[in-house]
Amino acid sequence: MAIKVFADGANLEGMLDMHDNGNVQGFTTNPSLMKAGGVTDYRAFAKTVLEHITDVSVSFEVFADDEAGMEAEAREIATWADNVYVKIPALNTKGESTAALVKRLSADGIKVNVTTIFTPEQVDEFVDAVSADTPSILSIFAGRIADTGVDPLPLMAESVKKVAVKP
């Protein structure tokens, strides 16, 4: 299993430094990080990032919380560059799964990064949802799981086996 390191943030200078140094294999950000980083124009920030970072994946998250809004945003974000992955949370704020949305997007060739995965059941659900023909990322929040006092290593080991069916 190859381990890939992704930088999570919204500081353009820091992202470019990490990219130029070859320290990471991809980048990801989210609305909270962008707000904390002082980003006021999401599209402009994303397009600036994508002008400079073209050879590794960059994940941008949807802001909407409802399925229709997420889908519209995801379809737009996916047009920004070939190396873009659209981050979709595993659950919305009502606790509803986004697996059906992920399945549609992935089937349509949109690269997704399913984020905030915490359970083996979610891993199963989203391994089933993504297309084997479209690259995808499943982001299991091992650090947050560990913060609750639960050892995330068994989940990670089992998840590696499960995702192997869709490399």
Q: Can you annotate each of these PLM segments?
A:
Residues 2-16, 20-24, 28-111, 137, ...:
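Active-site beta->alpha loop and helix N-cap motifs at the rims of alpha/beta catalytic domains
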Residues 103, 110-167:
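Catalytic alpha/beta core domains of metabolic enzymes, predominantly
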